[in-house]
Each structure stands twice: as C-alpha cells, then as structure tokens.
Amino acid sequence: MLGNLGENLTKTMKKLVGISVIDKKTIEEVVKEIQRALIQSDVNIALVLDLSKKIKKRALEEEPPKGITPREHVITIIYEEMVNLLGGEAPGLDIDVKPYKILFLGLQGSGKTTTIGKLCRYLQKKGFNPAVVCTDTWRPAAYEQLRQLTEEMQVPLYGDPDNKDALDLAQKGLKEFKNRKVIIFDTAGRHKQEEDLIAEMDTLDDIIQPTESILVIDGTIGQQAGEQAKAFSQATDVGSIIITKLDGSAKGGGAMSAVAETGAPIKFIGTGERIDDFELFDPARFISRLLGMGDIQTLIEKAEDSIDEDMAEKTMKNMMSGKFTLVDMKNQFEMMNSMGPMQQVLSMIPGLGNKVSKEASKMTEDKIDGYKVIMSSMTKKEMENPKLIKQSRIRRIAMGAGVEESEVRDLLKYYNNTKKTMKGIGKRGRFGNNSMNRMMGQFMK
C-alpha cells in the first residue's frame, strides 16, 4: 500500500532500533530519511517540514517516561506525530437514525460507483441491509453498473435509465425505501468548475437532507486531493472522505495528508480492486502498519468478518490433532484468500509485513491458486486420504489440472511438511514465530 512508503519507513525504524546511542546526529539522520520517504509519496513539503520540526523538538527536549528507553521514546514520538498528520482520531460510522441517508459525491473516475458497492458489502457484514438510489443521469452506463454491483450482493436498487430528472429520481427513491435503515444515493460525477452539476448537487442536498455526505477521492492524484476536498466543502456540507486506489499508489500518502489538513475526516479507504478491499480508516492502526509494527486488531476484525467460524474451528482441530487432510488445506487456502491480498494481511502481523516483498507475496498467491487448481482434479477419496496418491494418480491429476507432474509432487510435499509442522505444534501446545516462519518459508521457496 502507498507504493514504497511503508517499506522505506520500516527500514528507517529498523535502523533506529539497531542504533546503540540516540543523540542529536542520530535524530537528524532519522528525520531526513522520514522526510525523503514522505516527499517521494507526494506529501506536501510544508507538511513534511512541520512534521520534522515537531519530531526533532520532542525527541531532543522531552525526557522519556520511566521504564522507556530513549530509543523507544523516539519511535513513539514518530508514531504519534505521523498519526496526527493523518487526522489523529478515527471518525467511525454510527448508524444512529432511520433512515440513515448517505449522499455520495465525487469527480468522474474517482471510483465512486465501485465504492458504493464496497460500502454496501461493509454494511452487510455489520448487519445492515442498505438500499441504493441512482440519481446519476449524466453517465449512460451509471445505472447498469450499479445494477450489476447491487444484484451480486442482493442489495435493492431504485433507478430509471429513461428518467433524466435527478431530483425526481431522488424523491421517488426516498419514497421507495422509506422503511430502510440505510439509503445510499449515487450522484453524477462532478468537476469543481461545472456550475450546473454543482447547482444540481445543492438541490439534491435539499431534497434528500442526507444524514451524511461522503466525498470520494482518487488516491492517485496526490496533493491535489486537498484542493478537491476544499472545493466540494465550499459547495456543499461534506461530512467525511473516502480515499480510493491506495493499493498501488505512490502518491497515496500525499492524498491522505492533504485531505487531513483540510479538517475533513477520512472515514474509509479503498485498498484494492476486490469488493472486500475496503476498511474503516483509523490513523493509529494505519500508521502502525506503515511503520512495520503490525495491526493485530484489524487482522482479528478481518478474520471475524471473512472466515466461517465452524470451518475454521474444524480445520484447526484437524491440524493440531494430526488428522490434517487436503480438504483441510484447501479450506485453509480459502480462508486466507477471503481475508484479502496476502501483502495486506502480512502487513498486519507485527514484524512480518515488510519482511516479505510484494513480488514474493504475489508468487505465493499464484502458488496457492495453482495448488487449488491441482486439488480440483483430485477425487474426494484422494482429498480425504492423500496417502492414496501414488505415481499413476499423480500422472492423472497433472493431466486433469494441465500442469507438470513435479507441481503435483510439490503440492504433496507442502502438504506433508505442513501436516508435520502442525502436528508438532499440537504436541507442544503452542504456536510460535518459528512455526509461522517455517510455514511461510515453504511457500517463498
């Protein structure tokens, strides 16, 4: 996420941990490296210099609290000041009235419609049943795109591609979904100079009387995100911001810091192309991940939202007891996939996230996908009892999956190593870092 920003900041933190004496020279070197990393991520230079000044001043003048080493104190200062740079407090989403009406705003191409789909999925996971109203009469494919998104998730949609009156659509949508807990209104993509659209937006605001107006901003535009946020705030009451496309953007840090500077809270961030690559923004957790400190709480929440509890319990029981089969291993892969891209999940594990490169993570994901294809060519008996798989079966499975026989053997080797590792953990009754490293190491080979 955010290009190489996380990787560069983690390297700086590691260097700081390895330094024996924390003096003025050390602090200045660390601050310079932080400056370099942030400027490369398109963070405004004035903001970077202000952050640097605060870190330097606190690091040189503050006495570490009792029981905290000078090194730990400097790391804490860097963490706290970077959290402040991104707005400090996590805004959260409180659905406290019925109907809770959300008005979506944004420029064309910002990812607004896709983000509506992601928010619907997020709300469904939290126990809400949202409905969507399409008032975008300017873009020909707007209704059709929303229809496809909402149909997949069984979210009710109101719209009429033949009706070119956005205000009429909004009124009818309100009537249609008056008993719904959450109603989301999609609007036409705007440009800050488009006076007709801005006027329409003001009238829509009067008709809908939204509980919250959310502005969607493309994270790849960097510092310009701040100007967008200001322009929209002047035209209407923007309650919060969603920043999209942060998974591969080298300018994402610039976008986030520029928006935070306007005072508009960042409520959600889009972290990938999948419908589940979307999370409530918490500056403290986010910076913790960027600095390589992990984010266990978000990892737990992701697991709770994504994983079938009964399946997970059964798989873990089999793993620990030594009854681990290829069925269990396939379930394990499905659970891993459901939590999102591997690089993103690893970034939440303290000390592990930035040890594994993007390339290695991608290779691992590709290897898992390959293993799943191979397993789909196996019979139920073979999946439940892999000991049955001898040379003749290996040949048949390889032909069915369209792979080399060596790839089938590679899968069986990984399975046997995993079974052996998990059986050993079951006997010892604990799961340590070495066990995790051994399992990850098998994939990274």
Curated annotation (Swiss-Prot):
The keyword Translocase does not apply. Keywords: Cytoplasm, GTP-binding, Hydrolase, Nucleotide-binding, Ribonucleoprotein, RNA-binding, Signal recognition particle. It is found in: Cytoplasm. One of its GO terms (cellular component) is signal recognition particle. GO terms for molecular function: 7S RNA binding; ATP hydrolysis activity; GTP binding; GTPase activity. It catalyses: GTP + H2O = GDP + phosphate + H(+). InterPro entries: AAA+_ATPase (IPR003593), P-loop_NTPase (IPR027417), Signal_recog_part_SRP54_M_sf (IPR036891), Signal_recog_particl_SRP54_hlx (IPR013822), Signal_recog_particle_SRP54_M (IPR004125), SRP/SRP_N (IPR036225), SRP54 (IPR022941), SRP54_GTPase_dom (IPR000897). GTP binds at residues 106-113, 186-190, 244-247. This is Signal recognition particle 54 kDa protein. It comes from Methanobrevibacter smithii (strain ATCC 35061 / DSM 861 / OCM 144 / PS). The lineage of its organism: Archaea, Methanobacteriati, Methanobacteriota, Methanomada group, Methanobacteria.
